[in-house]
Amino acid sequence: MDAGKGEYQIAKSDEEWRRELTPEQYGVLRQAGTEQPWTGELLDESRAGVYACAACGAELFRSGTKFDSGCGWPSFYESVRPEAVELLEDTRLGITRTEVRCANCGSHLGHVFPDGFRTPTGDRYCMNSISLDFQPEDE
């Protein structure tokens, strides 16, 4: 995975990440893969709560900012704090996109698109379910 800002609060070796994550999680979180649309466990999650990084547990999104974008991945219009995520230019597919990573550990979460959807920010954070852990508010 390409380096982002270089230093993260949670810094582990590739070997440590491989031991701690499932192969599917590793492929998305550490190798910037993408899960298939409409397959993620959190796509239809509607309870109140917080979405945290599946790799390090850092809080990333709140359920109040989640919306149905119809794209097949969980979508949010903003992160819990601007500094909770890291935004990087991604040109891997021959187009320019903005990659979203966890600012705490550098794990790949998905991409953000400024395509409106009549949200308060106009942004659509299109996240991989496998990159997130949902923590219900009532637990």
UniProtKB/Swiss-Prot annotation:
Its cofactor is Zn(2+). It catalyses: L-methionyl-[protein] + [thioredoxin]-disulfide + H2O = L-methionyl-(R)-S-oxide-[protein] + [thioredoxin]-dithiol. It comes from the Bacteria. GO terms for biological process: protein repair; response to oxidative stress. Binds 1 zinc ion per subunit. The zinc ion is important for the structural integrity of the protein. InterPro entries: Met_Sox_Rdtase_MsrB, Met_Sox_Rdtase_MsrB_dom, Mss4-like_sf. It is an enzyme of class 1 (oxidoreductase). Keywords: Metal-binding, Oxidoreductase, Zinc. The active site is at C126. Coiled coil: none annotated. GO terms for cellular component: cytoplasm. Zn(2+) binds at C53, C56, C102, C105. PROSITE patterns: MSRB. Residues 14-137 form the MsrB domain. One of its GO terms (molecular function) is peptide-methionine (R)-S-oxide reductase activity. Its EC number is 1.8.4.12. Belongs to the MsrB Met sulfoxide reductase family. HAMAP family: MsrB. This is Peptide methionine sulfoxide reductase MsrB. It comes from Leifsonia xyli subsp. xyli (strain CTCB07). The gene is msrB.
